[in-house]
Amino acid sequence: MDIISGQALLLLFCFILSCFLIFTTTRSGRISRGATALPPGPPRLPIIGNIHLVGKHPHRSFAELSKTYGPVMSLKLGSLNTVVIASPEAAREVLRTHDQILSARSPTNAVRSINHQDASLVWLPSSSARWRLLRRLSVTQLLSPQRIEATKALRMNKVKELVSFISESSDREESVDISRVAFITTLNIISNILFSVDLGSYNAKASINGVQDTVISVMDAAGTPDAANYFPFLRFLDLQGNVKTFKVCTERLVRVFRGFIDAKIAEKSSQNNPKDVSKNDFVDNLLDYKGDESELSISDIEHLLLDMFTAGTDTSSSTLEWAMTELLKNPKTMAKAQAEIDCVIGQNGIVEESDISKLPYLQAVVKETFRLHTPVPLLIPRKAESDAEILGFMVLKDTQVLVNVWAIGRDPSVWDNPSQFEPERFLGKDMDVRGRDYELTPFGAGRRICPGMPLAMKTVSLMLASLLYSFDWKLPKGVLSEDLDMDETFGLTLHKTNPLHAVPVKKRANIN
C-alpha cells in the first residue's frame, strides 16, 4: 500500500505538531554543517521530506531518481536520513570497502513489534556475539558444503515428487500454478532439513496456500514502506496494519515451530539410549547445542527458524516462477535451454545436481533471472555506525543505506539491452552471484551475504532443469506470450503479483 494514500489526514495532522517541528529543526541543523559533502538528492517537502516520491514500488521510484541524482543519492524520509546506492562501484564501497561500518541493520517497525531484531540472524548487528553464534550455527549445522551435500538425496526426492505431480496434471491436461508447486517443493525441502517432516502437500491446496500466504505476508509486512519507519512517534498507531499482519503471521508460524520443538524435547526425554546424531536435523542440533556462549533458549530457536523458513521458501520459489515466466515469454530461449539439457541428460535419464555444472546455458538462465528479478530488490536496509565516505560523498552516522540491486541489474551503462531477457550475456564470462561481482549481487556480499545462497542456487537450478527436461510448456488458452503478465508486488522480497499458470506437456512417456 502507498504510505501516503489512506492516511493523508493523519499525516497532515502530524505536520502541525510543534514537538515534531522542534525535532526536525534540530536534525536539519546537524545536516547543514556537512551539507556540501552529502550526496545529491531531490528537493524535500516540509516534514515529510521525500516520502511522496516513494510510491508502491520503491525500487523503481529510486531507480528513476538515481538517473537524475546519481548512483549515491540522498533522501529524507520523514525523520530518517537515507542514502540509495545504484551502481556497482558504489555497491562495492558499501558491501566491501566499508562493510564493517555499514553492516548494522535498520529494522522496520513490523520487525521491532516482536523484538525480532534482538534475536534474528538477519537483523542483529554483525558486531554482536549473538550474531556470530547464530551465523556459525547456521553455517556449520545447516549450510556448510558438507551439510548441503548430505541433503542432496532429499532435494532429489522432493523434486521427483514435483515432477510426478506435474505429470499427473499433464495427464489431466490441467494448467499448473508454478508459484504454488515451487513453494510446496521448496517448503518440503526446508521443512525436512529443519524438522524432518513434509509441511506441504500438492493435493492439499487450501492448507498449503495458507502457509504460502502467511510467509508472503510476513515478507510484505516486514518490507513494505511504513509511515512509522519514518515517523517513530507514530509506531503505536500501526496506520497501515503492518504490525498486526506481521504479529499474526509470525505467531502462526511460531506455533508450527513450537509443536515440532515440543515433540522433539518430549522424544529426547523419553529415550533411554542417545539418538544417533548422524540422523539429527537442524532443530535437533540446536536443542543439543552446548557451547562457550550461553545456551540457546526456545525463543532463540524460534526466531532463527523464522529467518530460515521465510527466507528459504519465498525467495527460491519466487525465483523459479520468474524464470519460468521469462522462458514462456521467450520461447526460443526456453527451447535452447531444453536442447542443452536433453543433450547432456539423454532421452531417458533424470536430472542430477551433478549435471548442473555441465549446463552453462541453464546457469545463465538462472543468473539472468536474478539480474532482472532479484529476490530482495533493495537488499536488507543497512545503517551506518559511523560516518563513511562513498565515492566522495559523506554518509553520516545513523543513516539508512539501501543498495538498489534491482536498479543495478537494469542499468544500461552496465548491461547491453538491460530490459531484455538474454542469458547469452553470461556465456563465457566469469561472473556469478557469490558476492564477488557487484553488477550481480542478489544475495548481497561481505559479512552480510546470505548464508543460504549455496542451497538456494542448488534448489532453483535443480527444479528448473527438471521442469524443462521433463515437460514442454505452453500458456493457457487465450494467453499470448507477448501479453504475459509481469506485475510485481514489493515487500522485503519482490514476487509476482499474479501467479503464473502454465500447461505442461510430457516430453517422454516414462515420466511418473
From Swiss-Prot:
Keywords associated with the record: Heme, Iron, Membrane, Metal-binding, Monooxygenase, Oxidoreductase, Transmembrane, Transmembrane helix
Record EC number: 1.14.-.-
Ligand binding (heme): 450
UniProt-annotated location(s): Membrane
Main enzyme class: oxidoreductase
Cited Pfam families: p450
Obligatory cofactor(s): heme
UniProt superkingdom: Eukaryota
Annotated CDD domains: CYP76-like
InterPro entries per record: Cyt_P450, Cyt_P450_CS, Cyt_P450_E_grp-I, Cyt_P450_sf
Annotated membrane topology: Single-pass membrane protein
Family, per entry: Belongs to the cytochrome P450 family.
PANTHER family, A to Z: CYTOCHROME P450 76C1-RELATED (PTHR47950:SF22), CYTOCHROME P450, FAMILY 76, SUBFAMILY C, POLYPEPTIDE 5-RELATED (PTHR47950)
Protein name: Cytochrome P450 76C1
Gene of this entry: CYP76C1
